[in-house]
């Protein structure tokens, strides 16, 4: 027995350490002069594989990114880059705000099945138990606020780029919580995983829709450990139960950038109720006429509620096929019934009862992944919608199929990505009628700013990458002679903004 156990352990260790590790970009620093910015970094790879190194430049426009072609990039870039100390120099583009992505990968692949299998049903159950409770703006405001806080805290802790999209619904300000895991080379091509976090005012909302929120949270935790070509966006929608108000506002009131290409939405709408009992699944009126093959298959299986419903329209075939393929590949035990509704679903109102419909209206591909709501779960919108009525095995499999689709569609990278924001501004020396001197340059322990006729002013000092170092307002009396201590500032080039009512003076100051 001892030898057998030792052999099993040895095989496990060989398999564990045989997995090729992705390269890492470490110890990054940057130096900027009037013409270029140079990134110095260490490229490491546990197996000393040669790597491909890319550098991508994007112009930031609102919440979107516009790819920019920059000629003349030099240094350790391209194929067959060995490990060690590296440097890449980039000619500065015109004035504006930019995102610089350095990408390094070694040509190997991740074991996607192993990533899918990281979905933990005990974790899902724990999240569900915490989320369970009335989450409504009137009947359960305290619980709703607690759930909002936990979603925001999670998105922030995972080092995504979080934001909150707000809109008015009567006197209530709804909040859609967003986390962007931006893609390395195509950040404007976006996959979305969403779930609404509110529930009806008279129930604990375990299946509807704590299951969706817990599933989204689990995927966001796992996805955070990897890099992708495309972006993955997580959204917690507010006020779904009153008519998809949160998602309608997001789609129609500034949540989506016109520069974004939404390649697919996985909308979780009740993903935890499962029954293998005959006649546990009912169907909407007319279902057999619109979906005869699916209706016949459900009838042949004695109307068991043992499948996840994948609702799509014709515009959503790509993301639907990806979900079905993922289920077949990574979770073959998950039974999927796919329904393609005509147009945007006007003939099938029962299949428009979730946030995917807001995306359909906007022409974006989206799926509703659902256990069927009241057509299976008789606890729907009642006080009995509790966690202990749900099936963790089934829910876990839905989450696994979803994460598998995201891994494939967002193009996971077996490598590392370093992102840096860069601000390029041309210096402005003077304004008419105002005399300003900023000295010494290079600066020492004290930076002096003297002026005449400036009046009230604001001094703003930041690094060329946009990090704010100093900000202070001065009245007309104090603005004539300003002294700023700089002894603790690191060596770098800084942008000094001297803002007055007449305009802004920009100067670049160096500290050696």
Regions of interest found by a model, annotated:
Residues 1-22, 426-428:
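Bacterial Sec-dependent N-terminal signal peptides
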Residues 42-49, 59, 453:
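Extracellular acidic, Ser/Thr/Pro-rich low-complexity tracts
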Residues 82-84, 88, 96, 455, ...:
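A glycine-anchored, Pro-Gly-centered beta-turn/N-cap motif
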Residues 108-143, 198, 376-385:
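N-terminal capping segment at the start of a domain
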Residues 126-182, 336:
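A non-catalytic alpha/beta surface segment that caps or lines the substrate-entry region
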Residues 200-315:
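Acidic/histidine-rich catalytic neighborhood of metal-dependent amide-processing enzymes
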Residues 271, 277-422:
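Active-site-adjacent substrate-binding region
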Residues 429-512:
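C-terminal outer-membrane/trafficking sorting elements
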